[in-house]
């Protein structure tokens, strides 16, 4: 596996640990960099939610680029250990909250609003639609929300889900990045 690192910002260049195997599919540095160029590339505060955090690369990158804090959700115990190590690497653990549970359970417990949400679930389309509907129903999205979904390039997501619609969509190799906004 290619070594991964934070692409830019405060933590730029720092290495990220990843989990070997099929439990998580880390977003490559190239796709992550392109993804942030689509939506940013830098932020002035805000709250980020990563519902299928894996190694935490996306939310750690977002905080590195100016988000104030991140909530990372991960159910797999081995991935949680990698996540904890990657959060410790930032030396700013207080900016990250790790919820060790299923995404569906976390969605029932979360409070406040989020400005940026990352969705990269294992069963893309059905889970993305369900998760966005729940985020809208529970009023967890800020007015300026950006929801970034990473799927296989062949997955077709709906134009609109709840109160959000597709703003941008781009294919990078075998991955497709879809961004929803209000």
Which residues does each predicted region cover?
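Class I S-adenosyl-L-methionine-dependent methyltransferase catalytic core
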Residues: 1-182
């Amino acid at each position: 596996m290619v070594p991964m690192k934070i692409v830019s910002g405060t933590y730029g260049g720092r290495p990220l640990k990843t989990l070997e195997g099929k439990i998580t599919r880390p977003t490559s540095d190239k796709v992550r960099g392109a993804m942030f160029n689509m939506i940013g590339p830098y932020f002035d505060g805000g709250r980020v939610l990563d519902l299928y955090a894996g190694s935490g690369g996306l939310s750690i990158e977002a905080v590195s680029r100016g988000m104030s804090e991140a909530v990372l959700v991960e159910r797999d115990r081995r991935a949680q250990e990698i996540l904890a190590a990657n959060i410790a690497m930032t030396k700013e653990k207080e900016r990250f909250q790790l919820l060790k549970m299923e995404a569906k359970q976390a969605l029932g417990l979360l409070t406040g609003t989020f400005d940026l949400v990352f969705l990269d679930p294992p069963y893309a389309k059905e889970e993305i639609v369900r998760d966005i509907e729940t985020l809208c129903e529970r009023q967890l999205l800020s007015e300026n929300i950006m929801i970034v979904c990473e799927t296989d390039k062949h997955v077709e997501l709906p134009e609109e889900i709840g109160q959000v619609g597709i703003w941008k969509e781009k294919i990078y190799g075998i991955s497709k990045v879809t961004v929803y906004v209000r």
